[in-house]
């Protein structure tokens, strides 16, 4: 369910059944991981690991949270908007990513990201966050130094973008990813309207795409990946 409250309740059920047989807790995101950590694992000193490197989880490493994985959200957010910026400017897609732009923005392939030509996709690379390095990740909304330079508006003029987040209640998306997007949009001269979905229905998002003609570009985060036609049918009109 990816739901923190459900995870907190689940650990109570599991401990009632298994008690001290539980040696480690591993969660697919920090929202659920922190819920189980606070509800039971912290007091019982059971190592708990999550995913996303949310600020509260990173801070909790000092209190016994076992660790988490940074999705390099600062790179993810930059790549999302940078690909749009390059398309709008009509420049090579790799500009400011693997190839320096005029402002000096450039990522390191193999360290920060990888590119799949076959899939035509950029992927931010994960980083383990542990007791040894967690202090480097305490601000999850800080832009990445390598790509923090302002673009020249005479070469990259202001453009308007419609961007949705499929679930506004998701801890990572709302507390880390969207704030990072908002920190990058000004650097890339993009005026972005952010739309938060309910995580359940596509119509909760598409109903707020009433006038696509006023936008220069779109970044779509679908609830279900087989629902692309819900958006293309609107954008093709």
Language model feature labels by segment:
Residues 1-12, 26-32, 52-55, 71-77, ...:
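Hinge/beta->alpha junction and helix N-cap segments in small-molecule ligand-binding domains
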Residues 2-59, 181, 218, 223-236:
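Hydrophobic alpha-helical
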Residues 21, 64, 213-216:
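Short loop/turn motifs at secondary-structure junctions
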Residues 23-27, 38-110, 131:
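Exported/periplasmic ABC-transporter solute-binding proteins
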Residues 58, 135-140, 170-175:
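Short, solvent-exposed loop/turn elements at domain surfaces
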Residues 79, 83-159:
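Hinge/cleft segment of the Venus flytrap/periplasmic-binding protein
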Residues 152-171, 175-237:
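Alpha-helical recognition/docking segments in bacterial nutrient-uptake
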